[in-house]
Amino acid sequence: IGAYGNDGAGSNSGHVRVFGLSGNTWSQVGQDIDGEASDDYSGSSVSLSSDGSRVAIGAYGNDGAGSMSGHVRVFGLSGNAWSQVGQDIDGEASDDHSGTSVSLSSD
């Protein structure tokens, strides 16, 4: 679940929470995955792998490659914790808004 207006790591940094269903109860899987900085809008797009072990998170407001260049981060679940897999996938230039849409393959 993406909450791109969350303020956990700064105003509008955003975050993502993943939930799993056990019986009739939804429980959070792992920790909150917070955006990097204010106005990243992380969680504006989210894609979960078919087995639930990877999540791609778009942050279209990230400034890693220029103002509003955006980026995507991929996280893997190990035990009950999410950790980043590889480096940030940054947009190419300012105002690219990379990460507006993300999608993982089924494998």
Feature-to-residue mapping (PLM):
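Conserved beta-strand/short-helix segments
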Residues: 1-107
